[in-house]
Amino acid sequence: AYFGTGMEFPAILDTKNLDLPYNKKSKKIKLHKSHEWSLMLDDIVEWYNRAGIILIYRPNEVSLKWWLQAGGFNITYPNYDYYIDEKTMAKHIAIQNDSILKFAHKHKLTWEHHHKHHDILIAKKFPK
């Protein structure tokens, strides 16, 4: 499920909110995705210490270009009005990417290239 501004579910790190998209009786692993959680990674580690984290990194300019090619402001869902324009979106991408890189460095995570997309790097942090 996707969480964040303009998404069906807000990017709030509250168990009730995080459980909303899922069947309450299910024991399956839940996958929660949000660009905004890049700014809350330390909180996720502290509050949900049994949760794994997978970081996806793509350079700022490439991220913006991909987002525009995927439809940018011209798609109906999610609603990206919050980001106002391309310049503002680029600023948000840069802030989120910076947060991802700082978290990976702080936790000494290893980056691996995506198997198909050479410009995407992946790092994983799982509980010990």
Which stretches of residues belong to each language-model region?
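PAPS-dependent sulfotransferase catalytic core
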Residues: 1-28, 128
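PAPS-dependent sulfotransferase catalytic domain
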Residues: 35-113, 117-127
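Conserved two-lobed SF2 helicase motor
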Residues: 28-35
